[in-house]
Amino acid sequence: MTKGTSSFGKRRNKTHTLCRRCGSKAYHLQKSTCGKCGYPAKRKRKYNWSAKAKRRNTTGTGRMRHLKIVYRRFRHGFREGTTPKPKRAAVAASSSS
């Protein structure tokens, strides 16, 4: 038996399956850790030596359903429960007609 090319054809067991956190096929079944996101660790796996991978899945590459709204509210100091002042142009146009 050789340990090279000819023995690779005999492999038939799955080492990795889908990760429930990142969805990639990098969850090692025997180690029970994900090679891409580090699940089940609480902190997401991220390294500076792979700048391109950081660029692929950082904040802002997805929908940001909640953060989009937070950024907008931050610009005005998280004001709540106030009504906007009526615009002068709208008031003048309605009074002239």
UniProtKB/Swiss-Prot annotation:
Keyword tags: Acetylation, Cytoplasm, Metal-binding, Phosphoprotein, Ribonucleoprotein, Ribosomal protein, RNA-binding, rRNA-binding, Zinc, Zinc-finger
Name by which UniProt lists this protein: Large ribosomal subunit protein eL37
Regions crossing the membrane: none
Subcellular location: Cytoplasm
Cellular-component GO terms for this entry: cytoplasm; cytosol; cytosolic large ribosomal subunit; postsynapse; presynapse; ribosome; synapse
Pfam family, one: Ribosomal_L37e
Quaternary organization: Component of the large ribosomal subunit.
GO term, biological process aspect, one: translation at presynapse
Taxonomy of the source species: Eukaryota, Metazoa, Chordata, Craniata, Vertebrata
Zinc finger regions, C4-type: 19-37
Main location: cytoplasm
Residues binding Zn(2+), per UniProt: C19, C22, C34, C37
Modified positions (N6-acetyllysine) in chain numbering: K10
GO molecular function, one term: MDM2/MDM4 family protein binding
Keyword Cytoplasm: yes
InterPro entries: Ribosomal_eL37, Ribosomal_eL37/eL43, Ribosomal_eL37_CS, Ribosomal_zn-bd
Residues the record lists as Phosphoserine modifications: S96, S97
The organism's place on the tree of life at top rank: Eukaryota
Cleavable signal peptide: none
Family listed: Belongs to the eukaryotic ribosomal protein eL37 family.
